Amino acid sequence: VQIFVAMTPDETLYFANPGSWDSFNPDYYFHWADFNNEVINDWKGIASNLISIPMAHQLIGFYTVADDTDGVLKVMRSYQYYAASAISDKVSKTKWGEGNQRGGFIWHTTGSGKTMTSFKSAQLIANSNDADKVIFLTDRIELGTQSLKEYRAFADENETVQATENTYVLLTKLKSNATADTLIVTSIQKMSNIRDEDGG
């Protein structure tokens, strides 16, 4: 069992299987919500959303993370699922040759799982081959170091998350065709150095 769904007539909770019985932690029991973050407790709503097929398969197969830092399986909260799914769907539907791509943003508060959401989005895009490179840019060294550590802890054993010690290493990884160089964590400063060295 990877995910538990517990229901009463008035409430539904779902959570990843933490392993042993003494590892169950109420902090990781979540209410499923719709796209507008309205909680769904009604069993019919849960049956047609959370535990429907293919949604249940997708949640288990694509939206769980075996976190190496604490050895616990984690499942994404509903808003994380919707964010990661929307990002990867947008990338898969983008017509890259038209040159009209626009950026976007996902707004999460402190402690809401931004790093896991960004990692899962990056992983889904990388695994789908919808982009040659997936680059996670940070604006400061501490955030880059922490994000790299968490990305590596979230990654499957057959995935590699690349660090960039300097601009030259970043440029080398960007030019590389190696599958191991698909997912990269780097800084805005290193990326802008490449642009400056390239002449704009």
PLM regions with names:
Residues 157-165:
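Conserved AMP-binding/adenylation subdomain of ANL enzymes
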Residues 1-133, 142, 146-158, 182-183, ...:
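ATP-dependent helicase/translocase motor core
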Residues 138-145, 177:
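AAA+/P-loop NTPase substrate/partner-engagement loops
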Residues 193-195:
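Short, solvent-exposed loop/turn elements at domain surfaces
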Residues 167-184:
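Conserved motor-coupling elements within RecA-like helicase/translocase cores
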Residues 143, 164-172, 191:
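Short acidic loop-to-helix transition motifs that present clustered carboxylates
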